[in-house]
Curated annotation (Swiss-Prot):
Protein family membership: Belongs to the chloroplast-specific ribosomal protein cS23 family.
Domain of life assignment: Eukaryota
GO cellular component, one term: ribonucleoprotein complex
Protein location: Plastid, Chloroplast
GO molecular function (one): structural constituent of ribosome
Gene: ycf65
Keywords from the UniProt entry: Chloroplast, Plastid, Ribonucleoprotein, Ribosomal protein
Organism: Guillardia theta
An annotated GO BP: translation
Role of this protein: Probably a ribosomal protein or a ribosome-associated protein.
Coiled-coil residue windows: none
Name used for this protein in its record: Small ribosomal subunit protein cS23
Subunit-level organization: Part of the 30S ribosomal subunit.
């Protein structure tokens, strides 16, 4: 069972990602939202995860890979797919909002 998930704001001009820890049937925020392309969200997520030594390297890598996949999808496909299709592509993420 995963210990972490990504929370996503899917917007027209930005995508924002935050990391939440899964606790029981709920989640607890670990980070604030980091925006792409306004800022380098990937680097910010990386720095935030590295500042938490109790998160295993394997989990950090997995979260960063998921962040990369999400950002790439937003850049390449946001105009091609509906929001529902995007949500179905990332079923383990929590979509907190969209335009």
């Amino acid at each position: 069972m995963p210990k972490f998930t990504l929370k996503v704001l899917w917007l027209d001009n930005n995508v924002a990602v935050a990391v939440d820890q899964i606790i029981g049937n709920g989640t607890s925020p670990l980070t604030c939202y980091f925006f792409w392309p306004r800022n380098d969200a990937w680097e910010q997520v990386k720095a935030e995860l590295e500042s938490k030594p109790w998160i295993e390297e394997k989990e950090r890598i997995e979260l960063l890979n998921k962040t990369t996949e999400l950002i790439n999808c937003w850049q390449e496909q946001s105009k091609k797919y509906s929001f529902k299709e995007i949500q179905s592509k990332f079923p383990d993420f929590i979509f907190a909002g969209a335009n």
